[in-house]
Amino acid sequence: MPIAHLPGELEMYYDDDDFSDPWTQAEAVILHHGNAKNGRLWYAWVPLLARDYRVVRVDARGFGRSSIPAPVYQWSLEGFATDLAHLMDHLRIDKAHLIGETIGGTIALQFAYQFPDRLHTVTACTSPYKFRGIATYIDYYNLVQERGVEAWVRQTAHRRLEPDRSDPRHSEWYMQQMSQTAQHVVLETLACLATVDLTPILPRITTPALVLVGEHSAMNTPDRTRSLAELLPHGRLVEVPGASGYVQHSAPEQCVAIWREFVKTAR
């Protein structure tokens, strides 16, 4: 099992897939999952990318198959970004394309701010950039505290994969993956996120940035998507036509096709 032993007592699981021509040096694409998730959720992206890129899927600290900190760990976006930089060092990846989904996209933007020289591009899929003062995250915290992780996951599942637009088996598997996350990790990361607002740093991110969202997603609101792209100096918003829910999971083929075109023009 591929585990990187990294600073901060982190044993970080990752998948590393590269089916590019072996006599070439493929650029790396790093896929970062969201809160209470893991790298498995990116399964559909790998065959669409790995013929031309080295594709690394991470399980962030506390999630999936990576080590779980004891309660009261000091969570922060800066910490997640630093963990990722350490993994890149371990894998000898000097520079990469970074793609994050939901909170993974928020982390990706933080990484672009902290480590601009290590990225070719950054992509945020269905990702918020402002949490402070938004009651939704406090409501999520209370739900997880009172009823547990699985209750929260199932009660909010329709936001990720809309029932009438997705395979119910996909949705069930998705919920099972999320429900494995330790309760204290979900609570503590939600509490951390409730203090986050990336607004001050976004105008200072110089990396070419793609903001992806489903055309019919409940997350496709001007204050979440259009404003994010406008705050980024080199930001581009693409609403995936006809897509709903969390577009990175509901329409992976469309997302990858859009991303490939974005990378061509970003060079």
Regions found by a protein language model. Give the residues of each.
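Conserved HGGG/HGGXW glycine-rich cap/lid loop of the alpha/beta-hydrolase fold
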Residues: 10-69, 73
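Conserved alpha/beta-hydrolase "nucleophile elbow" surrounding the catalytic nucleophile
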Residues: 33-35, 96, 100-102
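Conserved acidic catalytic loop of the alpha/beta-hydrolase fold
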Residues: 78-96
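Flexible "cap/lid" loop of the alpha/beta hydrolase fold
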Residues: 106-114, 118-148
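Conserved alpha/beta-hydrolase catalytic His-Asp/Glu region
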Residues: 132-135, 147-204
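Short beta-strand/loop motif that positions the catalytic acidic residue
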Residues: 205, 211-213
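Acidic catalytic loop of the alpha/beta-hydrolase fold
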Residues: 215-220, 245
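Catalytic active-site module of serine/aspartate enzymes centered on a nucleophile-bearing elbow/loop
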Residues: 234-267
